[in-house]
């Protein structure tokens, strides 16, 4: 049994949860999220708590048990507080500029790269080297941050590129000039 899945989820004040079979709708101050869960799990309400339980003891039910509990918890946290992912741009001349809802990246290519956020995602620029991705759906926020990072991944020789805030990039040593070099 999943240790994470066994823990009940507390529903905070200001958040309403509507359960209809495997369809769950969570409404809060930041917005509304809806998800259809797998038939291998059941979700029930017990006072101010939500309880996720597997249907049966087969491998599929056990594997979706903890996942479903975490997804439901992320929905509740998202509509209450929201999620943020911060990115940093490292490198001489590399920058990001805001243009309406879009962000224009100048990251060492011969052209600029324009990123338009999908619905429900907000992009903001702090200074010219910090980008913040925010929204209520953790999966969409993380996916958007990963797409932005993939524009110019950090270089392992110089460390230049777009990285997550606090991400450690291991710098490789360059070519060593040895004894036989002429």
Swiss-Prot record:
The family line of this record is: Belongs to the universal ribosomal protein uL6 family.
Q: What does this protein do?
A: This protein binds to the 23S rRNA, and is important in its secondary structure. It is located near the subunit interface in the base of the L7/L12 stalk, and near the tRNA binding site of the peptidyltransferase center.
Highest taxon listed in the record's lineage:
Bacteria
Gene3D superfamilies linked: Ribosomal protein L6, alpha-beta domain
Output one GO MF annotation.
rRNA binding
According to UniProt, the name of this protein is Large ribosomal subunit protein uL6
Q: Name one GO cellular component term.
A: cytosolic large ribosomal subunit
Q: Name one GO biological process term.
A: cytoplasmic translation
Q: Supply the NCBIfam families for this chain.
A: L6_bact
| InterPro entries according to UniProt | Ribosomal_uL6-like (IPR000702), Ribosomal_uL6-like_a/b-dom_sf (IPR036789), Ribosomal_uL6_a/b-dom (IPR020040), Ribosomal_uL6_bac-type (IPR019906)
Q: What is the lineage of its organism?
A: Bacteria, Bacillati, Chloroflexota, Dehalococcoidia, Dehalococcoidales
The UniProt keywords, alphabetically, are: Ribonucleoprotein, Ribosomal protein, RNA-binding, rRNA-binding
Query: How does it associate, per the subunit comment?
Result: Part of the 50S ribosomal subunit.
């Amino acid at each position: 049994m999943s240790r994470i899945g066994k823990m009940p989820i507390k529903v905070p004040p200001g958040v309403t949860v509507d359960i209809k079979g495997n369809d769950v709708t969570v409404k809060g101050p930041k917005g509304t999220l809806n998800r259809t869960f797998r038939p291998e799990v059941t979700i029930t309400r017990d006072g101010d708590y939500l309880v996720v339980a597997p249907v049966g003891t087969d491998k599929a039910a056990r594997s979706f048990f903890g996942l479903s509990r975490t997804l439901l918890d992320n929905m509740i946290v998202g509509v209450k507080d929201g999620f943020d992912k911060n990115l940093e741009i490292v490198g001489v001349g590399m920058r990001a500029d805001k243009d309406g809802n879009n962000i224009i990246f100048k990251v060492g290519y011969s052209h600029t790269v324009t990123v338009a956020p999908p619905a429900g995602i907000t992009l903001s620029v702090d200074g010219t080297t910090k980008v913040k991705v925010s929204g209520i759906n953790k999966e969409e926020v993380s996916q958007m941050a990963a797409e932005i990072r993939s524009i110019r991944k950090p270089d392992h020789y110089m460390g230049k590129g777009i990285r997550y805030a606090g991400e450690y990039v291991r710098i490789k040593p360059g070519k060593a000039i040895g004894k036989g070099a002429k």
